[in-house]
């Protein structure tokens, strides 16, 4: 069953562009290589926020796929670590209507 997450990050002041580069060149391709589909990504520059929607539709399930992604050598090798840019995050599963 396809599961979709909305991920909303507040980024450290002045670091939004740097985070976007790390996300585009590191996070996104690694996620896609592991079977995730990036439905879209947006910035809200006036609020230093990055919002994206990611889905996964394979038998092992979203949570197992996230665990495998986080433990992957590619993710561990990301430098700078994308989480170092994030001040707060809101991550929720969303359903289509």
Enumerate the language-model features and the residues they cover.
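Active-site acidic-Proline motif in GNAT/NAT acetyltransferases
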Residues: 13
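Short acidic/glycine-enriched loop/turn segments that link adjacent beta-strands
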Residues: 45-49
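Active-site-flanking beta-strand signature of metal-NTP-handling nucleotidyl enzymes
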Residues: 4-8
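An amphipathic, aromatic/His-enriched active-site/gating alpha helix that lines ligand/cofactor pockets
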Residues: 18-39, 43, 55-93
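Short hydrophobic/aromatic beta-strand micro-patches
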Residues: 10, 53-55
